[in-house]
Amino acid sequence: GPDRPTAVFAANDLSAIAVIDVAREMGIRVPEDLSVIGFDDVPEASRRAQPLTTIQQPMRRLGSVAAEMVFSLLAGEQLDELHVTLPTRLVVRGTTAPPPESPGR
């Protein structure tokens, strides 16, 4: 219907894959009717018949920064930053498209 969303940004890739599966069961076409984006770029995201558009984050760097912070805290050191921002990358694959045209939008 006209109030149906045109896109879903899921918290992670596995949730995005579940959204795609449910959408298809409901007769909703991805990406023609609904764009779906995940987060993490897990291996399954690129191996599907319709590869998932996702946000890739530097997992190894994320782990090493977290470990460095834990070791600093265990050594009694004060952390300069409690929040660290690492770069991400949009990986466009087969589950996103411009929103469909419909009356009233």
Q: Whereabouts are the PLM-identified features?
A:
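Flexible loop/turn connectors
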Residues: 1-104
